[in-house]
Amino acid sequence: MKSNCVGCLLLFLAAALIPFTALAKERVLVLTDMSNEPDDEESMVRFLVYANEYDVEGLVATTSTWLRERPREDLIRRQLDAYGLVRDNLVKHAGGYPTMEQLLAVAATGQPTYGMAGVGEGKSSAGSRRLLAAADKPDARPLWISIWGGANTLAQALHDARRERSPEELHKLIAKLKVYTISDQDDAGRWLRLEFPDLFYIVSPSTTGHQEYHRATWTGISGDRHYRNGPMVDFELVDNPWLEANIIRNHGPLGALYPRLAYIMEGDTPSFLGLIDNGLGWAASPAYGGWGGRYVRYQSYAETHPIWTDSSDNRDTLMVDGKAHTSSQATIWRWRRHYQ
């Protein structure tokens, strides 16, 4: 018995000497229609505060149904300037933050026109080229495309890739991409799903208006009051008084760029929140659930093939004040006290 204990101790000590290898960060490229309403600017502040948690491959200004022309790369750069002022403070708390210069180098503007009218021969943009350059890196990790507005910059990138590459090369490119889009904010998302059925795509399909947003999983971030689709659990954490006290006022130049909410707080944040390595493993499969919500892969109505989306099987049930609440939004709001 004594020798067995000694053997166990030696094995434990040997294991302790093995170098610890940190988990690889997820790669992410953001497409944002910043300026049309406050929540994109709110989400960008959070994205930058967590910039040490992933490898940022691009920050691309785009159009959407709410911003049909003049993508605002200048607003991205304004937030990056503020990030540069606070980075020294951020690195006191955690390592891995990119420099302001590194982030400025991957900022770009996508398609200047709304939807599929901006996609076609000779319409490539700095944003679509940045996306392809990131995807073409000799890196085995997937490239997450976090779409906060319209999807036509991704559509242009894949339009160009299909025209210029062999079917085998295109297949390899598609296999590297993982898309999470905040509903359908132009007609390019539908086109992408029709033309590239193998593309990994998370979406709560919708018209290009807001009429179906109340059903979308992503509204669980803070949409309880505006969309009337949640029991307001810990809602004070996502409302203006808390945001002003804990982010906006007296929290430095980056916090000062966080606007008061007008509709919901950070509606675009679910598209990247699950990429933070918090132990829930969401990036491995959206079916696991986590800060980015829970999704299932199936062929919903009007889709031509399975996508990652909402269904009766992606809902969580939680008890609130003695009552059961079941919804897809619950897969996000259940974590509200943790992500705030």
PLM feature spans:
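N-terminal acidic, glycine/proline-rich low-complexity segments
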Residues: 23-340
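Hydrophobic alpha-helical transmembrane segments of integral membrane proteins
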Residues: 15-16
